[in-house]
């Protein structure tokens, strides 16, 4: 993959090496349940959506959406095609969700429909997908309009195959108001015979109108597509629309030709060039190097000119110029070196090594046109020398003082089933990767919006902790800042086999994860205790404690959505919206 290799710089001041553990707290968590008028518009996977990518993209979809500019407001889409808004004004007097928008077309008529999705591009703009392939851009006006349900369609257009909205932004560029949106789909790939038979498409759509035309029509400026073989964990557009950042198991690439999504990139074209027939073959023994190649059609021995120099070789063909010229890997004996014509158009050049026993790594330095053919006897000799370092048995000496790793002792977080995960930044102008970070042993955990005006944050596991990173596109030398740490959370979440959603509070006061059904786990940051505690085992005083709390829903319906504010957790099931009071209002 192109792009400069970078690394993430951990802020050591945000780490707590003395953190011990979370203490289970039995303090009650007030939970308020709101019954829904209509069930959530859940779309289950079809029989032809059988891959892991389908499950990640659509089977584990979060049906509950938050407005970062109104943190105590959440939204969902029900089976009556309505976008429903729920806002907490008073914990003891919960209202009912209200309709703010209704899709104008019948969604059930589409056989390959996906779940409807939405994202707040700004405080006044929302992007919506109905799950059938149509994109909506909605103006919601001021806060009172968003609560009263007066949302206005400013753009709607069918873009092709069904998709979900991943991320969107609103910006002003060159006197244009631009809405950028990322759309994700998993498409059938007939050319992928050995793989799953699908590829992942991430489309970057830019729609715009003149800034001074409040009621002007929006038109699509650009449509750019990224192709890959895995659903990205994280994908977001930079605030000014200059690039895209993503985290994925497998690499993505832009395609310039929308009509031919399988057109190879420049890198792939170079790879294809490298796969062509070699210009020549060469092999070696301890005393000499042999080079063989074919003369072009119509050429004879008289058309060939070969010059030997102690450290160079020059082969040219009449009317065709230089065939091979350059510095040899090591010096040769010119008097003993020779060449002969073989049967047909074959030419064999023998170079006598000046230093017998020296193994050449290449024939002509930096020349990639030839192919090395290993001598079977030499290969066997090397294998015999290395025999003592290899074994056909998994553990040939189980009584050894240092036995090999026991796979049964590995945790989930220690096993990497797929290719190495990368964090990449793609330039929006040249459509190439400019920065690449190999995450290696830092698995992705979750995504969260801490500051609405900035890109979403993402959390990665570092050792046992979960570190929260804020992308900052204005700092090319330090694109990702470490802004918060959740102690031991990386270790804790690895033990939760049934976890479904993961999030945290915007002020980082707590993190939370939920299982597929009922249970929610809350992990609070360390806070001072009212009375000082004494650790008798270590003989020291403890001034602060990190608490863990567990909440359990009354319903056994599967959890479909999960969002957090500084004070509350919102949990969505098929027919109920539960509000858990986590913190008191500051």
Curated annotation (Swiss-Prot):
Keywords: Cytoplasm, Nucleus. Signal peptide: none annotated. It comes from Xenopus laevis. This is NudC domain-containing protein 1. It is found in: Cytoplasm; Nucleus. InterPro entries: CS_dom, HSP20-like_chaperone, NUDCD1. It comes from the Eukaryota. GO terms for cellular component: cytoplasm; nucleus. Transmembrane segments: none annotated. Gene3D superfamilies: 2.60.40.790. Coiled coil: none annotated. Residues 275-364 form the CS domain. The keyword Nucleus applies.
